């Protein structure tokens, strides 16, 4: 469907893209099971497979695609339109892949479609970052392909399911997923590229690539113990870089890496509660991190910079953008009554039930860091702090609509967690709003806020 976009006028493109997302969303009602296979040379490619794990990821990717299209509606750029819809389509198709070779095809498709969003930054830095990005992403695909071939040779099939890193094939596939999930020492591409993309491109990038990797890890490596320690390290080390970073979009990129760590820990635990936590956190994260990137993208669009040292005092001129940014910041910080709280609580509780006290306290420290660098630093330096002298207009109406949709979702998920929990892979009887959970989280947030005040 994306091939028609260049031939349509601006308004027609936006309407057509939304139509494609809605049309794709009908697939969510197909039910669980295998819906489409293609036989080539006696090999069955499972093109469309759905179950209780893929469904919540597919739902939120459709939501993110819809919001991203609205967010970018002010731009008359058919190349970016094609990239956004193709990228979203590739991610959705990858979520429904039932075998490793089908996954490989769409895995690489997400790489080649998303690179154009980085090129859309239209700077020398963006062009160089895009080259590095595609090399890394194609490398991930090559590991996946090599692992798939070995897996087929060893097992007689290439079904996408539970694997072990004790096998060479499993280890190669694990490495492929780890690159896309931005594991420690494999994560440089994320902070290198996301801040260089266009304001629309960064929103799309934050939603699809890394969450596809989390889905793949949950599909194939749930309960792999080493993921607990990899994830804990991911939550920990980006905090220090985010605290000292001046570019607020790069701060959010470090923060994204930190949040992925929570999901990876949950996948490593592998219990039903933990997998629910990983999926819930990925779902909520796509929305609130997209909201934060949208708010900073609006600032970049109106002011021309996202450097903290050059911003401040914008609340007076961009109040709606500021409020939406604050809602995103509150959500990522896991304040009660917002989406981050009801998602992250599942992960923290699963750690407690498994007796992983050291990892639990590492994630508590990481949670305090999230409040510092994303919950406070982002809205404070952009919209408050010192007066920068900038007097921009409020964001365009389409940007505001997209940010308001994201804000409303952050609030609704936080207020109605039982409804949210119904789409998770496993049935769950969990109450996030018991007294101990709320009190401990408020204490953590209070002390983290106090630390920010002291350091500032």
Region locations from a protein language model:
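Alpha-helical transmembrane segments
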Residues: 1, 16-27, 62-65, 85-89, ...
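Transmembrane helix-loop-helix hairpins at membrane boundaries of multipass inner-membrane proteins
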Residues: 1-82, 157, 161-162, 188
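Hydrophobic alpha-helical membrane-insertion segments
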Residues: 18-29, 140-146, 328-332, 402-418
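Membrane-helix interface motif
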Residues: 29-38, 150-157, 332-347, 412-431
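Short aromatic-rich membrane-water interface segments that cap or initiate transmembrane helices
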Residues: 41-57, 163-170, 350-361, 433-439
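Hydrophobic alpha-helical transmembrane segments
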Residues: 50-61, 176-177, 360-368, 435-454
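Hydrophobic transmembrane alpha-helices and their helix-loop junctions in integral membrane proteins
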Residues: 67-78, 82, 86-103, 113-398
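Cytoplasmic/organellar membrane-interface segments at the starts of transmembrane helices
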Residues: 316-320, 377-456
């Amino acid at each position: 469907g994306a091939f028609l976009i260049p031939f349509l006028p601006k308004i027609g493109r936006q309407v057509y893209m939304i139509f494609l997302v809605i049309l794709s969303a009908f697939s969510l009602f197909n039910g669980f099971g295998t819906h489409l296979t293609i036989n080539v040379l006696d090999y069955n490619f499972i093109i469309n497979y759905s179950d209780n794990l893929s469904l919540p990821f597919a739902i939120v990717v459709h939501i993110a695609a819809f919001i991203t299209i609205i967010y970018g509606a002010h731009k008359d750029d058919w190349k970016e339109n094609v990239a956004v819809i193709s990228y979203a389509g590739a991610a959705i198709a990858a979520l429904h892949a039932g075998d490793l070779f089908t996954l490989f095809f769409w895995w690489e498709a997400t790489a080649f479609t998303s690179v154009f969003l980085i090129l859309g930054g239209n700077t020398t830095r963006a062009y160089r970052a895009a080259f590095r990005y595609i090399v890394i992403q194609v490398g991930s695909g090559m590991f996946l392909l090599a692992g798939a071939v070995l897996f087929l040779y060893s097992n007689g099939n290439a079904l996408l399911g539970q694997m072990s890193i004790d096998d060479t094939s499993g280890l190669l596939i694990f490495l492929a997923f780890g690159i896309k999930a931005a594991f420690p020492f494999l994560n440089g591409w994320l902070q290198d590229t996301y801040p260089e993309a266009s304001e629309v491109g960064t929103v799309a990038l934050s939603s699809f690539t890394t969450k596809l990797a989390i889905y793949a890890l949950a599909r194939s490596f749930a309960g792999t113990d080493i993921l607990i320690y990899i994830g804990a390290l991911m939550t920990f080390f980006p905090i220090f870089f985010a605290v000292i970073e001046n570019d607020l979009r790069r701060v959010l990129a470090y923060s994204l890496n930190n949040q992925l760590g929570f999901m990876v820990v949950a996948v490593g635990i592998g219990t039903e509660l933990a997998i629910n936590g990983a999926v819930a956190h990925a779902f909520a994260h796509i929305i609130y991190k997209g909201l934060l990137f949208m708010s900073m993208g609006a600032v970049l669009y109106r002011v021309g910079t996202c450097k903290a040292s050059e911003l401040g005092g914008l609340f007076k001129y961009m109040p709606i953008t500021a409020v939406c940014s604050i809602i995103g910041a509150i959500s990522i910080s896991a304040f009660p009554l917002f989406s981050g709280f009801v998602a992250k609580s599942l992960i923290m509780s699963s750690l407690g039930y498994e007796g992983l006290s050291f990892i639990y306290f590492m994630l508590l420290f990481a949670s305090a860091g999230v409040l510092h660098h994303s919950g406070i630093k982002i809205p404070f330096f952009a919209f408050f702090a010192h007066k920068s002298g900038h007097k921009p207009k409020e964001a365009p109406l389409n940007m505001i609509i997209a940010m308001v949709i994201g804000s409303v979702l952050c609030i609704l998920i936080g207020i109605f967690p039982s409804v949210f929990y119904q789409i998770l892979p496993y049935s769950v009887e969990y109450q996030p709003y018991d007294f101990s959970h709320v009190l401990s989280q408020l204490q953590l947030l209070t002390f983290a806020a106090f630390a920010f005040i002291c350091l500032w």
